[in-house]
């Protein structure tokens, strides 16, 4: 969707992280795809809003953080069951299998990381921390 603005926020220094490039690529693409789909779902109901995704990458020495922040439909429809989205076969999508986020979670755990889903009033924040 060319109307979605994606901002990358990062330092100019190189980041080094020992991990499986293909698996980590799958994680990042899946999460960004989910953000895009969330914004598209919101656009079906709300016609006039700025469609934004920001992706922030930080190196804190002992760990690396990746934060994906979007202004889509968010997690509000999950009530207090945000952790359920990591369960295999849990889906909120009409044609979803429910495997995407459970696979994402496994890959992150296999890389000594953890993922956090943070609801906000207008969208969602996904925060991943990888220990070095």
Task: Report residues per predicted region.
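Conserved micro-motifs of the catalytic ATP-binding
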Residues: 16-19, 92
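Detector for a conserved hydrophobic position within an alpha-helical segment of the HATPase_c
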Residues: 108-109
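A residue-level detector for a conserved hydrophobic packing site
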Residues: 24-25
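ATP-lid-like helix-loop hinge signature
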Residues: 36-61
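Short alpha-helical Gxxx[C/S/T] motif in the catalytic ATP-binding
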Residues: 100, 104
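Short conserved segment of the HATPase_c
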Residues: 75-88
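Conserved catalytic submotifs in the C-terminal HATPase_c
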Residues: 3-15
């Amino acid at each position: 969707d060319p109307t979605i603005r994606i901002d990358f926020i990062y330092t100019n220094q190189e980041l080094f992280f020992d991990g499986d490039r293909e698996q980590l690529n799958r994680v990042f693409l899946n999460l960004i795809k989910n953000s895009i789909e969330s914004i598209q779902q919101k656009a079906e109901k709300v016609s006039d809003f700025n469609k934004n995704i920001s992706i922030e990458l930080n190196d804190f020495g002992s760990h690396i953080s990746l934060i994906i922040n979007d202004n889509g439909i968010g997690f509000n429809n999950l009530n207090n069951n945000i952790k359920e989205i990591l369960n295999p076969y849990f889906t909120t999508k009409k044609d979803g299998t429910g495997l995407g986020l459970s696979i994402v979670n496994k890959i992150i755990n296999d890389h000594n990381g953890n993922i956090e889903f943070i609801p906000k009033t207008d969208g969602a924040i996904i925060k991943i921390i990888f220990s070095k």
